[in-house]
Regions:
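Mg2+-dependent prenyl diphosphate-binding active-site environment of isoprenoid biosynthetic enzymes
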Residues: 1-237, 241-254
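Short cytosolic juxtamembrane segments of multi-pass membrane proteins
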Residues: 257-258
């Protein structure tokens, strides 16, 4: 587990969660625990995603994947342990002194990472290797597999702050941000190289999988991701100077090279 965490990563989801928490006045000691939980869910998903039965990858974040560095059985258990640890942290009283808030967070994280979210999206991703999916189905796949964890990162601060008027604002922000992130990921798979990206590229093309880039075309995909980021920034601009770091993060999503 230490190996998986220490090899690096962008930590985007916890960064987004902490920035929104700052905007809404959530205490750092509370938001940090939820940020750790979402990052551990993300770590679990990557470890399992890299397994031979899934994407069968041997490189992640520029280092050997968990099942290559250790073995397949260990990698499965590591993923399981990350998932358990995420819920152990988020359910603790230190996360929030209101048990209803903690229950709400647990429910949302379970939905975002389970069959109605990330796991459901991964199932659609496996189906995409066997049959051609429509653009609508690809959008659904990415909304579940990638977008739901972004959604949790954006709404969890509203739950922590008990400010539910902002819930819809940040949920809308997350939908645009998550899709822009996935389009950029698909573009990096086509245009990037393994050294910069930190993982093998060209995988989807080799597997014959349809992606947002293959269906939209590279130029249209770039325009779409740029438009989504511009729309997401407009949503949070009313928060003024407090949203500056969050705006920088949004711009980073389409300017990154890994």
């Amino acid at each position: 587990m230490k190996y998986v965490v220490k090899v690096g990563g962008k930590r985007l989801r916890p960064l987004i969660l902490n920035e929104i928490s700052s905007i809404l006045g959530v205490k750092t000691e509370n938001s940090d625990r939820v940020a750790a939980s979402i990052e551990f869910i993300h770590c679990y998903s990557l470890v399992h995603d890299d397994l031979p039965a899934m994407d069968d990858d041997d490189l992640r974040r520029g280092h050997p994947t968990c099942h290559i560095e250790f073995d397949e059985a260990t990698a499965i258990l590591v993923g399981d342990a990350f998932q358990s640890l995420a819920f152990e942290i988020i359910s603790h009283k230190k996360t929030h002194n209101n048990s209803e808030v903690r229950c709400h967070l647990i429910t949302e994280l379970a939905k975002s990472s389970g069959a109605e979210g990330m796991v459901g999206g991964q199932m659609l991703d496996l189906e995409a290797e066997k049959k051609t999916l429509s653009l609508e189905k690809i959008f659904q796949l990415q909304r579940l597999k990638t977008g739901e964890l972004f959604r949790f990162s954006c709404i969890a601060p509203c739950i922590l702050a008990e400010k539910f008027k902002e819930f819809e604002i940040f949920e809308n922000f997350s939908s645009k941000l998550g899709l822009a992130f996935q389009i950029k990921d698909d573009l990096l798979d086509v245009e990037g190289n393994a050294i910069d990206v930190g993982k093998k590229t060209g995988k989807d093309l080799k597997k014959g999988k349809e992606t947002l880039v293959s269906l939209l075309g590279k130029e249209n995909a770039k325009k779409k991701s740029k438009a989504l980021i511009e729309e997401s920034i407009k949503i949070i601009e009313p928060f003024g100077e407090k949203a500056k770091n969050l705006i920088d993060l949004a711009n980073f999503i389409i300017s990154r090279n890994k």
